[in-house]
Amino acid sequence: MKNHGMNPYLPSWEYVPDGEPHVFGKRVYIYGSHDRFAGYAFCQNDYVCWSAPVDDLTDWQYEGIIYTRAEAAHNEDGRQCLYAPDVTCGPDGRYYLYYALNETSAISVAVCDTPAGKYTYYGDVHYPDGTTLGARPGDEQQFDPGVLTEGKTTWLYSGFCPPLMPGRTGALCYRLTSDMLTVEQTYPAVVPGAQTAKGTGFEGHAFFEASSIRKVGDTYYFIYSSELSHELCYAVSDSPCRGFVYGGTLVDNADLGLCDTARYFTGNNHGSIEQINGRWYVFYHRHTNSSLFCRQGMVEPIEILPDGRIPQVEITTSGPNGAPLPAVELRELPAYAACNLYMTQPPQVNAEAGQNPFPYITQDGADVMPESESKPEAYICNLTPGTVVGFKYLNFQNVTKVSVKTRGMCYYGGFDVLLTADGEPIGTVSAARGNEWTWQTTELAIPDGISAIYFRMKGYGTLSLAAAKFH
């Protein structure tokens, strides 16, 4: 299912956040939770898996449902949701899926003979006496497991540390035996939470949730969501269970840290890094539909420097492609591929979006599964004067016309076109007015070369934007 290498890397109607990427054989598999479009809570759908060839991150294949809420232990009434999982290949060559339910402090495990087959419940992580991890007096909440198998040893990381919640120490670490369930050793928190981070290198970026672990050479990288929630950070150590030192921010889903103000609407973040065909990437997610519960997977190339540091990367449209997108060769540039969406003027209220005054990415139609014959179209709604829609990066060659597909009631409407967020417009494109989607083409030469492009709305009223074309 090719998408020209644009973010989000899965189809616009798919909502798989918390992505843990793992290369098994010649494919990279994504294991995440599964949001429901227009849902009322996190992770309401069953676990699904998508995969792509390691040499083509534009060609994602739906592998199917791999585990359902109905199959999960401790969920007899089906009321609980499957929260963020992780998968590891065990010493026996089978694949083990570690997960937690939203209201149960336990890490459960399901197993499968293949990376993306039907997983079956295997058991709960437990102490040697059989007591479930998380059930002993004094145990902290088990949440967001991350796993790494080395030989016959599996390292399990877990934890949930809201900054104001008492009794939470940080990211928890456990060594498991070769049965993949029994705790052989427990360790003090490897990364402190906000209540214990004062005076450490983690202060201001303490552990919140989203444990993930990778080994790069001889160095262990612990990836996590910080107390700020919208950034993924990393810590490094030469040991999997102690000595982690704060490294920095990998990615922020609003580009904070790289920009003084948010370039997208912030929300929680979860993901990890993976080496794919010799190149390293960070997987993370963004929020859509003006909701915490409609999250989509994103990916960017990263660079691990010789000293082990990983500079923060910006969120882009072209991340999966690993290079700027060819502007003219794209049939069209969908609006949902915008990596920047923000306002420079006070918001207005759009009747189409009820009382929400902010622009956001949404879709026409209900939540769908890949098997559905018809798929909803995604677009940006609630654009008001001063709203900026940005795409990074495109390779422009011989562009003399720009078209936009819009609908809405906007008078004297259109978009100033900019090549830098704070630069001067290189021209203006007109937008059609009406309740039906309509293309409007304007003659506008864009200089040859690699650039971002921004559409800043002007006029009076509101618009929705579905796509742009470059001719």
Question: Locations of the language-model features?
Answer:
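Carbohydrate-active catalytic/glycan-binding domains of CAZyme proteins
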Residues: M1-H471
